[in-house]
Amino acid sequence: MACPVQLGFQDAASPIMEELTYFHDHTLMIVFLISSLVLYIISLMLTTELTHTSTMDAQEVETVWTILPAVILILIALPSLRILYMMDEITTPSLTLKTMGHQWYWSYEYTDYENLCFDSYMTPSSDLKPGELRLLEVDNRVVLPTEMSIRMLISSEDVLHSWTVPSLGVKTDAIPGRLNQATLMTSRPGIYYGQCSEICGANHSFMPIVLELVPLKHFEEWLLAML
């Protein structure tokens, strides 16, 4: 989860988020190099007193500044496309979780099991226990197993929502009348927080998401207690 005064990403807890973090660093390095070069050229132009007025065109320079941006765009596009295809890759899921957005709460259904569904509302500040997070805790957490492929089916009952968990690199729109799909796989157990990331009305800020990722054995014990 995020920490106070944090400037970077949250710690990655899924392979997709790790790839997104690497891509961010890769792109930021390219942007930094380009910005440094531009600032260096501008400083030279402002400080030098020499001018070259006899040259009307420079074929070599024009060739370089045409090819170089194309190469830079390719260096950015290739890893971006790779991650895009990884995020859209469909594998045989071990578990399917259907998520519905409402104004202003989430409902979840474990479609592989009968009668296993519940609503998840934000815990009011007056009901928080010591150590719990304001505006991020819910009355019913989503419990999922780690290191297993989980298919998320996401839609909405009313207006646009967006189911987002930053640590897992998941952000999928919940659109009324449309069923969107996302694949979720975590590399380690823990509690991960998210929020609705699409303006959906007056209480948009009060739609937290809490995932509790546990080993398979503990997940099976939770299932037995819920069924």
Swiss-Prot record:
Entry GO CC: mitochondrial inner membrane; respiratory chain complex IV
Pfam families listed in its UniProt record: COX2, COX2_TM
Record has Transport as a keyword: yes
Cofactor descriptive note: Binds a dinuclear copper A center per subunit.
Binding site for Mg(2+): E198
GO biological process terms on file: ATP synthesis coupled electron transport
Stretches in topological domain Mitochondrial matrix: 46-59
Mitochondrial intermembrane topological intervals: 1-14, 88-227
Keywords attached to this entry: Copper, Electron transport, Magnesium, Membrane, Metal-binding, Mitochondrion, Mitochondrion inner membrane, Respiratory chain, Translocase, Transmembrane, Transmembrane helix, Transport
Enzyme class, UniProt record, top EC level: translocase
Membrane-crossing segments per the record: 15-45, 60-87
Assembly description: Component of the cytochrome c oxidase (complex IV, CIV), a multisubunit enzyme composed of 14 subunits. The complex is composed of a catalytic core of 3 subunits MT-CO1, MT-CO2 and MT-CO3, encoded in the mitochondrial DNA, and 11 supernumerary subunits COX4I, COX5A, COX5B, COX6A, COX6B, COX6C, COX7A, COX7B, COX7C, COX8 and NDUFA4, which are encoded in the nuclear genome.
Xref: PANTHER family: CYTOCHROME C OXIDASE SUBUNIT 2, CYTOCHROME C OXIDASE, SUBUNIT II
The protein's name in its UniProt record: Cytochrome c oxidase subunit 2
Gene: MT-CO2
